[in-house]
Amino acid sequence: MKKRNAVISLIIMAALVAGLCYTAIVGLGADKSGSISKIHLGLDLAGGVSITYQAVGETAPSSEDMADTVYKLQKRVDQYSTEAQVYREGDDRVNIEIPGVSDANQILADLGRPGSLYFIRETDDDGNPNYGYMVTEEGSLGYGLTRTIEELDATGDIVLSGTDVANATAGYQSDSMNNRQIVVELVFTDEGGKKFAEATKRAYDQGETIGIYYDGGFISVPRVQSPITNGQAIITGEESIESAQNLASTIRIGGLKVELEELRSNVVGAQLGQTAIQTSLRAGIIGLALVMVFMIAIYFIPGLTASIALVIYTMLMIIILNAFDVTLTLPGIAGILLSIGMAVDANVIIFARIREELKTGASVQNATDTGYQKALSAIIDGNVTTLITAFVLMWLGTGSVKGFAQTLAIGILLSMLTALFITKFLMKIFYGIGFQDKKWYISSKALAEKKVEPIDFTGRKKIFFGISIAVILAGFIAMGVRGASGQGALNYSLDFVGGTSTDVTFNQDYSLTELEQQVVPVFESVTGDSNVQLQKVAGSNEVIIKTRTLELAERQELTQKLSEQFGIDESSIQAETISSTISSEMRRSTMIAVILALALVLLYIWLRFKDIRFGASSVIALAHDVLVTLTCYAILRVSVGSTFIACMLTIVGYSVNATIVIFDRIRENMQMRKPGEKMDDLVNMSVTQTLSRSLFTSLTTFIMVFILYIFGVASIRVFALPIMVGIVAGAYSSVCISGSLWLVLRGWFPPKHDDSGARPKQNKLKAKTDEEKRRLQEKRVWDKTLV
């Protein structure tokens, strides 16, 4: 690229970056489209309530009944928030999410009461109106009650209820003039038909209406044209078939016999959500800045281009979250910050390759092109395997775990875009501007190191294997001791055992003794149970208290007592309840997800490397990383909750990335293997050549997660700590174990032919003389002996 073109390209790129930053931070237009403030926040960030119901009864509900139930609940939650969502899960479950509400406990109470449908007489026996056209409580004109439902019921002015309606359907019918009209047809039960006959006779005689009242408001007030004695009625006058269908559905759901049981509920105070956002943003900014400083300090101009690409990556992530309306949760933020650390991985692989080429005497331009070419396969393989784990999470995960998987998958795809295209384009721009000397790409000391002395990793494999076995055994011993003492092998959260967890942020930092003396008695007085578990969150006033499953009334009483005795705002109290049904499903999903991810990774590596030994070695190394992380959970008593599956699969995806880079180098070096070179030496050289990549990538990702752990809220720390352990375990297994494992398996199951993964290119030149034929034949024979 010529200097003039490079300068123009740099100006365009600067304008592009500025535009992306403006869009992501400020937004476009009056509605600020694309800005970070417009991202749809999950309940753990926006505050609110979520609840999962399951239909119970002797017979399974029909699909129509469940659809009506969803419609019924959606109508009820719309009054709380325009962003409220109600959706089915499977055949018999309904999920409700209502963000940004203040009195979440009251909403839970309202949702717990079934919506009632009533048919009400227009006047009582004395001629007083039971309802009329008036200004409603919402300030609009419409029909409203003059007396309460209880008063109407006591005087007998409620003539039918929802259970008296057998069915309601919308359709078309011809009137007496043969005109097609929209109607709602009602069919009553036998008892309901008798009641309706009496009510319509009275209404017809007095020229009155019968109001149909549902869940706090009138849905229709039809005038009675004649006594209806056949148990069927027609309502006319609807403006559209859609409005008729809505009316029919509302009448049907008013008489639903579907009984709903609460499986899970979560109440998050708005203040807790705001704190989580602020701390996570702070962690992201600090972590990103540290990674950028590290990259520039280590890699000079390439590090600068990677830093610019990281800024572009971050801004694009914000814009994409807006464009696809992805709901951002706390684990989702963790996924973004983790993917920022992982985005550095591709750049580190490329820059390490570029430096290797520079050491051979190649020019900066040639070294850059060759570096990108040689790094491509490792980058693709590593990112595909990480995507596999993300897709498994999206498939088997629920709620916040699925949000984590979505942001992680988006981050992986964006990281490939920025590393393979944007960073390379920036490298060409800086080269064209004038940064053509090798000193801008590699230190003189590193450039002088022409030969890399291999480290004998395989010779120390017994030591490395022994360390790993000892750590894993320590974890199993800890689980056994804890289990025998009745504490539980692992510190299972509600997601795995069920119960109620109350997260309280006090106005001061109480000691554990003070909590046991002052707070525990409050919980015991409400629960009537002495089994109350306390967990202080280090560095904050936050305390997590676990109890048996609490009913809604008990949760409300507990919130009131905590607020009165400790002066806590209700927005600082978060409660979550999970049934044993959900917890057993969570345990099963976790096992399936981990096993499925390992199997898919094994299959991909086997197909990609055409060597089952590479795949088996990778899976064993991944199992090692998972078990070491499990040791962390066992010894440090880290809470095993809904993010456990996300944590384990993240470690699987991240660790296999590092292992693939080493295996890719082994495969490459086998194609250039020298006569008589021992396989141990080849493996040691391959691991040594990729050592800087393994260490630098692990360090940058560790920095991001460590900052997240330092500044994050409790739920983020529970996720970040095992991830840090997994990063260290993954780096250790990739460098110290994976190559030796492959070597051991190769010894146990020796190849029958050249299994390097790719054969050397054959010389396609035609020999013109006998001497040339002989030399060419010798070369082909020599190529075939490189096993």
Where are these regions (language model features)?
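A structural signal for conserved, well-ordered secondary-structure elements
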Residues: M1-V787
